[in-house]
Amino acid sequence: MAHGIPSQGKVTITVDEYSSNPTQAFTHYNINQSRFQPPHVHMVDPIPYDTPKPAGHTRFVCISDTHSRTDGIQMPYGDILLHTGDFTELGLPSEVKKFNDWLGNLPYEYKIVIAGNHELTFDKEFMADLVKQDYYRFPSVSKLKPEDFDNVQSLLTNSIYLQDSEVTVKGFRIYGAPWTPWFNGWGFNLPRGQSLLDKWNLIPEGIDILMTHGPPLGFRDWVPKELQRVGCVELLNTVQRRIRPKLHVFGGIHEGYGIMTDGYTTYINASTCTVSFQPTNPPIIFDLPNPQGS
């Protein structure tokens, strides 16, 4: 597998034979392809906040999984904020408004947000099913009327909201998608395999920065308590073999906070909350050279 250069030509990703078992997939590809081993794949130390931004660069501030616990977060200097979902507990409009107010007080030139599995009201199909089931799993959501959440994303007036869509800011093409492998039936959950691959196939080539809620296989996706990898195999194959972004930012797995690289793409798990839901993981900053002509 080539490292350090973008893939050439049209690449078609198919469902991986180990799709349903990410831990087995990791072991197989590590043994047979050295796919997750040094020198290409390694941990990356975070940039200290007092590091001067290089000339001709844009500084990104990455956070995720704040879960309505933003009051004590110390936000560093930067140009563009990236939040990769789970900014609420249940996606209640009151939570979204509070988050939007917090965003409004931040000084970043652009603030880009995607949903996570906790933003229940942002997932229209999920909410339709929940109504049919009489809200039995999420009784606090039952107090909402459909008109309260039909256009809940419009409450995010202080950010750019992405859902299977892209935006270009300061010359960077940024794509965002909320989907994650099924886990206890939360929002934006899909079965591993073709269902998720169909979503990843929507991501166009030429993206500079990919925002997803969950991790790809093998990069900050280890859950120690379960002794399992939980990242998406199809997402990994899409990122490494087809899209080749400069930066892939995600969260979802609180235990996986940190930075890795495969020699071409930098992977950032920016989960702010720990596994015990304490918002103590600091935001991660990352500098990228400005695209030519921007």
UniProtKB/Swiss-Prot annotation:
Can you tell me which residues bind Mn(2+) 1?
Answer: 65, 67, 86, 254
Specify the superkingdom. Eukaryota
Chain residues that bind GMP: 117-118, 225-226, 252-255
Keyword annotations for this protein?
Cobalt, Hydrolase, Manganese, Metal-binding, Nucleotide-binding
Q: Where is the signal peptide?
A: none
Tell me what controls its activity.
Inhibited by nmolar levels of AMP and GMP.
| Residue sites binding Mn(2+) 2 per the record | 86, 117, 213
Tell me which EC number(s) this protein carries: 3.1.-.-
Query: Can you provide one Gene Ontology molecular function annotated for this UniProt record?
Result: phosphoric diester hydrolase activity
Q: What class of enzyme is it?
A: hydrolase
The Swiss-Prot or TrEMBL record lists the needed cofactor(s) as: Mn(2+); Co(2+)
Q: What does this protein do?
A: Displays low metallophosphoesterase activity (in vitro). May play a role in the development of the nervous system.
Similarity annotation: Belongs to the UPF0046 family.
Subunit comment: Homodimer.
Name of the featured protein: Metallophosphoesterase MPPED2
Where does this protein come from, organism-wise?
A: Mus musculus
